[in-house]
From Swiss-Prot:
Active site location: H361 (proton acceptor)
Positions annotated to bind Mg(2+): D103, N225
Reported cofactor(s): Mg(2+)
Keyword Magnesium among record annotations: yes
Name of this chain's protein: Bifunctional protein GlmU
Residues holding UDP-N-acetyl-alpha-D-glucosamine: 9-12, 23, 74, 79-80, 101-103, 138, 152, 167, 225, 331, 349, 364, 375
One GO BP annotation of this record: lipid A biosynthetic process
Gene: glmU
Species of provenance: Actinobacillus pleuropneumoniae serotype 3 (strain JL03)
Catalytic reaction annotation: alpha-D-glucosamine 1-phosphate + acetyl-CoA = N-acetyl-alpha-D-glucosamine 1-phosphate + CoA + H(+); N-acetyl-alpha-D-glucosamine 1-phosphate + UTP + H(+) = UDP-N-acetyl-alpha-D-glucosamine + diphosphate
Length: 454
């Protein structure tokens, strides 16, 4: 099987984005456009990925530092052909070279596999698409059904402008062919640039076959040159993802008001209300219900969990039949056992909450272990930070912590203990002890409230 290398063009400035950020780093579904393209290139088993960079190259390399790409500088942006010329020295004669664009993030593995499979043994395969309004795109010129040239909009005559089949810019040919054609490119055109599309005419002159493969969906090959186009890509992507989830059995109350910016795996009878955002890798069990306005990121949710409105869960695990929210925040390291309750305005960070325990109101639990069947009252704080270091709070089983208590870590509260409301606990508490640390109540007779001065 012939090996494949991929060239991704990513040197453009993106002037119409009106941004200091390189165009290809603008995001779709929370991920840079160029990252989508790199990920797709990996899926088709590219031997090597050549990334053509220019504007904002330092930032681009920083953001993609973990990616196994060959960085190829295009110091001057003189057209798509010029960009490919920079990568040509790295091409092996006997490999296939696939050309992609860093600002066209939604092209699929399946489409690229069709294109590669269609490449003639001696020739080039080109991805095209039919448009109702082809304005702005290079037109596909055919003779007797075969592609003989691509004419850019600014160079097209009146008859050619009527053609609706357009070039997507995606093509595949052998390394040897590309090197030969790229060496013969010129910039004799209205833009004064080196067009990669000129290789189509060269292939015909050499007697090579040019095979066109049509993309099934225009948005799959659409690029983003401005924020309006970027928003259109985002909406198309989200619509596609929502449709996949609906067909897989997930109930989305309103598919148009659901965003996924990562991956979602799910069980049966999952229900997701409006304005929910999924980020990173999220796993949902059976019969999970997520109410309006929640954000879930890199978390695992067990069966029969209900997440009430406007809760945020990040890098956390929630056990079966738990109830979360409304307005709860589970931060990284939160691990809730089954049948736990976490209520409104509760924040849990790097803490384990045991089976059946309840933390229902206005509470912070950080760097802690809470046993089973505990009740943590409203306004309780685990004081885990002394300004320099963090310390752990350990709470046993069947512990009752009264409202407005402060647990100053490091501290351990043993099984069955009761902490009276308003206590400040600084020492360990033994099993079944009652701790009260409040100031004795005083009654002042005849006291009068201050009055305002006239």
């Amino acid at each position: 099987m012939t090996q494949l290398s991929v060239v991704i063009l990513a040197a453009g400035k993106g002037t119409r984005m009106y941004s200091d950020l390189p165009k290809v780093l603008h995001t779709v579904a929370g991920k840079p456009m160029v990252q989508h393209v790199i990920d797709t290139a990996k899926q088709i088993d590219a031997k090597q990925i050549h990334l053509i960079y220019g504007h904002g190259g330092e930032l681009l390399q920083q953001r993609l530092s973990s990616e196994p790409v060959n960085w190829v500088l295009q110091a001057e942006q003189l057209g798509t052909g010029h960009a490919m010329q920079q990568a040509a020295p790295f091409f092996a004669d006997d490999e296939n070279i696939l050309m992609l664009y860093g600002d066209a993030p939604l092209i699929t593995k399946e489409t690229l596999e069709r294109l590669i499979a269609a490449k003639p043994a001696n020739g080039i395969a080109l991805l095209t698409v039919e448009l109702e309004n082809p304005n702005g795109y290079g037109r596909i010129i055919r003779e007797n059904g075969s592609v003989v040239a691509i004419v850019e909009q600014k160079d097209a005559n009146a008859e050619q402008l009527k053609i609706c089949e357009v070039n997507t810019g995606v093509m595949v040919a052998s390394g040897a062919s590309f090197k030969k054609w790229l060496a013969n490119l010129n910039n004799n055109n209205a833009q004064g640039e080196y067009y990669i599309t000129d290789v189509i005419a060269m292939a015909n002159q050499d007697g090579y076959k040019v095979q066109a493969v049509q993309a099934s969906e225009f948005m799959e090959v659409e690029g983003a040159n401005n924020r309006l186009q970027l928003a259109a890509l985002e909406r198309f992507y989200q619509k596609t993802q929502a449709e996949k989830l609906l067909l897989a059995g997930v109930r989305l109350i309103d598919p148009a008001r659901f965003d996924i910016r990562g991956s979602l795996t799910h069980g049966k009878d999952v229900e997701i209300d409006v304005n929910v955002i999924i980020e990173g890798e999220v796993k949902l069990g059976n019969r999970v219900r997520i109410c309006a306005g929640c954000v879930l990121k890199n978390c695992e949710i067990g069966d029969d969990v209900e997440i009430k409105p406007y809760s945020v869960i990040e890098d956390a695990v929630v056990g079966k039949a738990a109830q979360i929210g409304p307005f709860s925040r589970l931060r990284p390291g939160a691990n809730l056992a089954e049948e736990t309750h976490v209520g409104n305005f509760v924040e849990i960070k790097n803490a384990q909450i045991g089976k059946g325990s309840k933390v229902n109101h206005l509470t912070y639990v950080g760097d802690a272990e809470v046993g089973s069947n505990c009740n943590i009252g409203a306004g309780v704080i685990t004081c885990n930070y002394d300004g320099a270091n963090k310390f752990k709070t350990i709470i046993g089983n069947n512990v009752f912590v009264g409202s407005d208590s402060q647990l100053v870590a490091p501290v351990t509260i043993a099984d069955g203990a009761t902490i009276g409301a308003g206590a400040t606990v600084t020492k360990d508490v033994a099993e079944n002890e009652l701790v009260i640390s409040r100031v004795p109540q005083r009654h002042i007779q005849g006291w009068q409230r201050p009055t305002k001065k006239k």
